[in-house]
Structure formats: C-alpha cells, structure tokens
Amino acid sequence: CQNVYAENCRMDSPSLDRVLRIKTNSCRGGVIENINMRNVTVGQCKEAVLKINTDYEPREVCCRGFNPTVRNVWMENVTCQKSRYGVMVVGMPDACQVYDVDLKNCQFNGVWDRPFDRSGKSHDIYFDNFTVNGSQMLTSAPYQHWSEWLVRSEMQRVAHPYLLDFAK
C-alpha cells in the first residue's frame, strides 16, 4: 500500500474505532509507505487516533518470516476530542520495521489512557507542535542528563544566575 491521502475530513461517529489504522503482520510482509492525513477533525474514537500494528492477528496460522515495513506516515492538523489512546505503535519484537512517523500541529483532547503507547521496535517517530490533553508531547527528553536540568532550574530560580558558581 503506497501513496494514500486523506484530507479535509470530518469524522464524528460514536462507532468510530480508530482514525488512522495501519495493520499488517509477518504473514503478509510488504511495504506500507507514504500515508498522508491532514486537516481532519474528529469528534471521538473508541481506541487510538493513530494505530500502527505490525503484529496483527498473532495467532493466525500461516508461513511467517515476511517482516512488513511501515514508513513515512504523516499526520498534520488532525484534532480529536475524545479517545482512549493518542498514538499506538505495535512494532515487531525482533526487527525495527516502523519508522519515519510524523505528527505535526495535531491536538488530541480527552485522551483517557496513554497519550503514546509503543511496544516492539520502532524509530524516528517525531512530534512537532503535538498536544495531548493540553500538554506538549516531546519526541525525546529535553535534557540529555539530569545535571542539565538541575543547572537550568537553578538558573531560572536565582534572581542573578550569573552569580552562580557550580565549580565548588
């Protein structure tokens, strides 16, 4: 599945399970790429606004070993007023096949469980101006080490931070 576009949509059914769902498994394999969604307004959904699942139907009897790849998933200007999860990514346990997922200018309110739920392997998931329940979601920690946080918080706390001497 490649080059899918959904834009300028309004979804407002109480029966809506997910807004954008990508499902595959190691029986099917293949590449799912260039999935684009923008300018979408959602009233509510039952599970996740975005769900990527590369382990769909794990008990399915089949010949396994065809690891699927999900890449280049892009959501911009998507709002949702109520859901259980914000973003849910279920990657393969042994291969990193989910990557380059971007959420930009998205706002999910009324998320009552986890805003970002990830299991298995995935990488390069980016959030740019993405808020859940009014809080900004970050792709990574704002500080590399706790000492950076400590220095910054002390500099904000003290009226004249240039007088601080951390060498002692």
Regions found by a protein language model. Give the residues of each.
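Extracellular/periplasmic carbohydrate-active domains that bind, remodel
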Residues: 1-168
